[in-house]
Amino acid sequence: MQKRWDRYGEVSWFSMAGRRWVAALGPDACQEVLQNKDRAFVNSDGWSVLIGPFFHGGLMLLDSEEHLRQRRIMQQAFTRSRLEKTVDVLNPAIASALDAWTPSDGFRAYTALKALTLNLATDIFMGGAEGTTESEIDSVKKAFVDCVQAATSVIRYRVPGTRWKRGLDGRRTLENFFRRYLPARRSRETDDLFSVLCHIESDTGQRFSDGEVIDHMIFLLMAAHDTSTITISTMMQYLGQNPQWQNRCRAESLALSTSTPSYAELDQLAGLDLVMKECLRLVAPVPVMARRAVCDTQIQDHFVPAGTYVSVVPHFTHHMPQYWPDPEHFDPERFADHRR
C-alpha cells in the first residue's frame, strides 16, 4: 500500500474479485467515504461481493432506514446490564478452557485461541444446544470457519472442492441449525444472545423476524470469534516480545485479587487497555472496509463513477508516519492521556 500511496496518492484504481475498485488511502479519503455526506456509498453492495453469500443480513451489510431500524433493535442486546451478565458467564468458561491448555515449544496460540473463542461463541451465545450430538456441534463450528474462509476464495463459483462451495454449504448448515432451535428460544426468554435476539424490541416496539434473528446470529457469532482471535493473538505476540509491558499488565491483573474480574473491574486494567489499542493499530482485525458508489461522486476531488467498488483502508492510516511516530514500533503509551 505504501508503494501505491507513493505512486498514485489517496485515490487509485485496481482490480479484485473480477471487478474494478478504487482504493481510498489516508485519513481524509477514508473519512470522506465513511461519513458519506451525500449518501453516494452503500455498505451492502460493497460487502456483498466479498462476503454477502455467507453473511447477508448482518448489520454491516445493511443500509439507510433498514440499517437504522435493525440497529435500534440490536442495541438493546448490548446494554451494560446484559454485558455484565455475559462477563460473569464467560469468566468460568474461559478459566476452564485455559486450564486445559498445555503450552510447549510447538504450541500454536492462534489455533488454540480460535478454538477457544469459537467454543465460547457456540456454547454461551447460543445458550447450549439441547438435544444435539457432539458431531452436530462440530459441524456447526466447521460451518462458521468455512464461511469465514470462503471470503478469500479465488474461485468464486459453486465449484466442488473450493472454499466458495464450502462456504455456501456452511451457510446452509448454520441456517438450518438456528431455524431448528429458534422456536424454543421464542417460547422462553433466557440470557443467551440467541434468546435475547428473539425477544428484544426497539423503543417503538419493533422486533426481529425469524429470518433476521438467524441472519444476525450467523454474523455476530462470526464476528465474535474471528476478530477476537486476531486481537488476542496479536496481544500475546507483542506482550511476549515486550516483557516490560507483560510484567506491567500482569501486575495490574494480580492487583485485582481475582481470577474472575467483573465488568467494572476490567476497566481498571489501564495497561492492558493501552496494549489492546496499540495492537488494534498494528494489526487491524478488519484492515479494509468495502463500499460501492450508487451515483457519480468524488473522493478527494477524484471522480468516481456510479457502480464503482471502493476499498477503504484504515490499516494503511494506522501505519502512516505523519500521524504515528515510528509506526512499526510497539508503543502502547502513544494512547496514554499524556501523549494525546
Stretches found by the model and what they are:
Residues 80-83, 185, 263-270:
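Conserved, non-catalytic sequence blocks in retroelement Pol enzymes and Pol-derived host proteins
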Residues 195, 312-340:
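Conserved cytochrome P450 K-helix/beta-meander segment immediately N-terminal to the heme-binding cysteine loop
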Residues 42-48, 66, 82-231:
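Cytochrome P450 heme-thiolate monooxygenase catalytic core
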Residues 1-69, 88-96, 170, 295, ...:
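N-terminal membrane-proximal hinge/A-helix region immediately C-terminal to the signal-anchor transmembrane segment
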Residues 1-9, 176, 180, 259-300, ...:
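Conserved cytochrome P450 K-helix E-x-x-R motif and the immediately C-terminal K′/meander segment
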Residues 117, 225-252:
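Cytochrome P450 catalytic-core helices
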